[in-house]
Amino acid sequence: MLASVAGPVSLALVLLLCTRPATGQDCSAQCQCAAEAAPRCPAGVSLVLDGCGCCRVCAKQLGELCTERDPCDPHKGLFCDFGSPANRKIGVCTAKDGAPCVFGGSVYRSGESFQSSCKYQCTCLDGAVGCVPLCSMDVRLPSPDCPFPRRVKLPGKCCEEWVCDEPKDRTVVGPALAAYRLEDTFGPDPTMMRANCLVQTTEWSACSKTCGMGISTRVTNDNTFCRLEKQSRLCMVRPCEADLEENIKKGKKCIRTPKIAKPVKFELSGCTSVKTYRAKFCGVCTDGRCCTPHRTTTLPVEFKCPDGEIMKKNMMFIKTCACHYNCPGDNDIFESLYYRKMYGDMA
């Protein structure tokens, strides 16, 4: 009798497991995967089962947005940090405390500082490397005695220096050069001493996306325990759907800070900001220059999700932008952290 019942019960159990509701954010009632084969992930990115236990997906990497459905790369010791137990919607992929860093073929302990080159001083923190430039990033504006300043690499010196070029075609006024400006952020003074603690804070990294919602990060020890910690904020340099080149005035080659017709609401993975914002965004150029944030500030933004849950995220707000020719080279990983090109985003 028991044997005769065991067969149907086992079959029913298997069917129940195969048709179980998927759990986690945005999981459908049943597992439904794309008909095509599993996605092809970039080199170094793991192919894992999604948080619903249904489909194979490319794991999210350090600093990327994650959800219960879109997991972080477990093979790199990453987990989805939601910030607080109340917020279980959207997090940021973070390395576990004490995770080492692998860079340039070398392994560095968490908390260890090193020079990646003569230009950058770096620190490993829980699997992530944060770097600050050692070379001066001063600005030299065009002047009568130096109308065409540019930075050049001099023999025997690590840091680039300013030199003055004579214009090829002299005119009465001459073309106006766009001066490069390092992004100016508001934070603690890096030289400030406090209770046996030298407060140090890296610059905010460039936004991970040149259009749409992205992530910007920095490393600081500006806290009660003087312990290095990673901070992240949302950022949007410009909306993806905006065709900004149409707004460039006749005879001009750039639009530095385009005017937004009406206040906007920000969207983040299906959640919408509670308030509307008359935000500023950076424009574009048609002559090869990059337009990037110059002055920014960080403010909290509340997002309301379809299920009524409210979550709060820090977000970058642009005060001014600068358009310049000092776009990063494709082979300089650290320059791209600060002065990322305004095209060719990798999804």
UniProtKB/Swiss-Prot annotation:
<dbReference type="GO" id="GO:0050867">
    <property type="term" value="P:positive regulation of cell activation"/>
</dbReference>
<dbReference type="GO" id="GO:0008201">
    <property type="term" value="F:heparin binding"/>
</dbReference>
<dbReference type="GO" id="GO:0043200">
    <property type="term" value="P:response to amino acid"/>
</dbReference>
<dbReference type="GO" id="GO:0016477">
    <property type="term" value="P:cell migration"/>
</dbReference>
<dbReference type="GO" id="GO:0005938">
    <property type="term" value="C:cell cortex"/>
</dbReference>
<dbReference type="GO" id="GO:0032967">
    <property type="term" value="P:positive regulation of collagen biosynthetic process"/>
</dbReference>
<keyword id="KW-0272">Extracellular matrix</keyword>
<dbReference type="GO" id="GO:0072593">
    <property type="term" value="P:reactive oxygen species metabolic process"/>
</dbReference>
<dbReference type="GO" id="GO:0035988">
    <property type="term" value="P:chondrocyte proliferation"/>
</dbReference>
<keyword id="KW-0130">Cell adhesion</keyword>
<dbReference type="GO" id="GO:0043434">
    <property type="term" value="P:response to peptide hormone"/>
</dbReference>
<dbReference type="InterPro" id="IPR006207">
    <property type="entry name" value="Cys_knot_C"/>
</dbReference>
<feature type="disulfide bond">
    <location>
        <begin position="290"/>
        <end position="327"/>
    </location>
</feature>
<dbReference type="GO" id="GO:0032330">
    <property type="term" value="P:regulation of chondrocyte differentiation"/>
</dbReference>
<dbReference type="GO" id="GO:0035963">
    <property type="term" value="P:cellular response to interleukin-13"/>
</dbReference>
<feature type="disulfide bond">
    <location>
        <begin position="33"/>
        <end position="55"/>
    </location>
</feature>
<feature type="disulfide bond">
    <location>
        <begin position="285"/>
        <end position="323"/>
    </location>
</feature>
<dbReference type="GO" id="GO:0061448">
    <property type="term" value="P:connective tissue development"/>
</dbReference>
<keyword id="KW-0237">DNA synthesis</keyword>
<dbReference type="GO" id="GO:0097553">
    <property type="term" value="P:calcium ion transmembrane import into cytosol"/>
</dbReference>
<dbReference type="GO" id="GO:0008083">
    <property type="term" value="F:growth factor activity"/>
</dbReference>
<dbReference type="InterPro" id="IPR036383">
    <property type="entry name" value="TSP1_rpt_sf"/>
</dbReference>
<dbReference type="GO" id="GO:0034059">
    <property type="term" value="P:response to anoxia"/>
</dbReference>
<dbReference type="GO" id="GO:2001235">
    <property type="term" value="P:positive regulation of apoptotic signaling pathway"/>
</dbReference>
<dbReference type="GO" id="GO:0051385">
    <property type="term" value="P:response to mineralocorticoid"/>
</dbReference>
<dbReference type="GO" id="GO:0071398">
    <property type="term" value="P:cellular response to fatty acid"/>
</dbReference>
<dbReference type="GO" id="GO:0071333">
    <property type="term" value="P:cellular response to glucose stimulus"/>
</dbReference>
<dbReference type="GO" id="GO:0070542">
    <property type="term" value="P:response to fatty acid"/>
</dbReference>
<dbReference type="GO" id="GO:0001503">
    <property type="term" value="P:ossification"/>
</dbReference>
<dbReference type="GO" id="GO:0051496">
    <property type="term" value="P:positive regulation of stress fiber assembly"/>
</dbReference>
<dbReference type="InterPro" id="IPR012395">
    <property type="entry name" value="IGFBP_CNN"/>
</dbReference>
<feature type="disulfide bond">
    <location>
        <begin position="254"/>
        <end position="291"/>
    </location>
</feature>
<keyword id="KW-0358">Heparin-binding</keyword>
<feature type="domain" description="IGFBP N-terminal">
    <location>
        <begin position="25"/>
        <end position="96"/>
    </location>
</feature>
<feature type="domain" description="TSP type-1">
    <location>
        <begin position="196"/>
        <end position="241"/>
    </location>
</feature>
<dbReference type="GO" id="GO:0002062">
    <property type="term" value="P:chondrocyte differentiation"/>
</dbReference>
<comment type="subunit">
    <text>Monomer. Interacts with TSKU.</text>
</comment>
<dbReference type="Pfam" id="PF00219">
    <property type="entry name" value="IGFBP"/>
</dbReference>
<feature type="disulfide bond">
    <location>
        <begin position="41"/>
        <end position="58"/>
    </location>
</feature>
<dbReference type="GO" id="GO:0010628">
    <property type="term" value="P:positive regulation of gene expression"/>
</dbReference>
<dbReference type="InterPro" id="IPR006208">
    <property type="entry name" value="Glyco_hormone_CN"/>
</dbReference>
<dbReference type="InterPro" id="IPR009030">
    <property type="entry name" value="Growth_fac_rcpt_cys_sf"/>
</dbReference>
